[in-house]
Amino acid sequence: MAEVKLLGFWYSPFSRRVEWALKIKGVKYEYIEEDRDNKSSLLLQSNPIHKKVPVLIHNGKRIVESMVILEYIDETFEGPSILPKDPYDRALARFWAKFLDDKVPAVVKTFLRKGEEQEKDKEEVCEMLKVLDNELKDKKFFVGDKFGFADIAANLVAFWLGVFEEASGVVLVTSEKFPNFCKWRGEYINCSQIKESLPPRDELLAFYRSRCQAAAASASAPK
């Protein structure tokens, strides 16, 4: 029987991407929680370049970067497909996944920075939300009729974004501004494939609230 291990952080949307893919495929795995402030030798040896989670270990082989891991899982294990079978739909799924992944830094920094830098990040995130709101009109999933690759990549904006907003007090998403996105987000969070695998929202909120407070304190400290 194949040995599958996943190194991750409980609060990380990137780790959750991999967990969801494994669950969709029905792959049994061992989850190993890492300590952000004291990373294990296994993590450092498995991802010596970036030293980050997630890391998938399959029969001793180490695979890193969440979207790379998703494709590996889809190609390696039997079970429901994560990427569409149709070449055009597969290309669309990869396009939206990359679009969403490229926006991660701006989304995160919006809630950790202040002043002009924050305003620039907010503008970029709002432009992204406009694009998504237009794309998601009358759609339940990004590509096709089932939850898949691009939807997994969207977990940061579907769930974590709302937590970031509440933790920081910076509100970007309203149903008036982005009605299609808000409708899609509500259905996403209640999707049976992921609902039971979301991290506890209250714990996630407390974690990111402390990070936002630490960032604010650092920004206001004398230089």
Swiss-Prot record:
InterPro entries for the chain: Glutathione-S-Trfase_C-like, Glutathione-S-Trfase_C_sf, Glutathione_S-Trfase_N, GST_C, GST_C_Tau, Omega/Tau-like, Thioredoxin-like_sf
Catalyzed reactions per annotation: RX + glutathione = an S-substituted glutathione + a halide anion + H(+)
CDD domains, per the entry: GST_C_Tau, GST_N_Tau
GO cellular component, one term: cytoplasm
Protein keywords: Auxin signaling pathway, Transferase
Induction pattern: By auxin.
Residues the entry annotates as binding glutathione: 12, 39, 53, 65-66
Enzyme Commission number: 2.5.1.18
Tissue: Root tip-specific expression.
Location of the GST N-terminal domain: 2-81
PROSITE patterns (UniProt xref): GST_CTER, GST_NTER
Record carries keyword Transferase: yes
The GST C-terminal domain, residue ranges: 86-218
GO molecular function, one term: glutathione transferase activity
Broad class of enzyme this protein falls into: transferase
GO terms of biological process kind: auxin-activated signaling pathway; glutathione metabolic process
Family, as annotated: Belongs to the GST superfamily. HSP26 family.
Protein's recorded name: Probable glutathione S-transferase
Phylogenetic placement of the source organism: Eukaryota, Viridiplantae, Streptophyta, Embryophyta, Tracheophyta
